[in-house]
Amino acid sequence: MSEIMISKEAMQYIHMAGNLLKIDILDCIVSNDRLVFIVRKGQLGIAIGSKGKNLEKLRNLFKKNIKFVESDSDTKRFIHNLCKPYSVKDISVDGEGSGAVVKIQVDPSDKSKLIGRGGSNIEIIRQLAQRHHSVKDVQIK
């Protein structure tokens, strides 16, 4: 697992969201139109809030789409969490240590959505997998 370097902008988002929702936010990826927060295991329900009210609060505050992902010490479960809400059929980890390659098999109807426009979704998944686990690359099958 590599050392996590968080930008000043991401730190501000983490601080504001964490204080507002009273949860532990471990990481944040800032994209053009969205924020992806990694929350401590067991705090996903609190982060989203009843009927998604906390998501809506943050959307209004930051004027960006918000996604929460639950952290997990198991690489496969963490990758599965990153891929939600898409239908993941299988996740395999080839290799060990910092050279591990994760291969995700998804339902064909979800493949393009998981990759995202211009590869934006898969790039975020790669970044977070590398930051939180010893993963070299993430591939979609």
Task: Specify the residue positions occupied by each region the protein language model found.
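RNA-contacting regions in translation and RNA-metabolism proteins
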Residues: 1-141
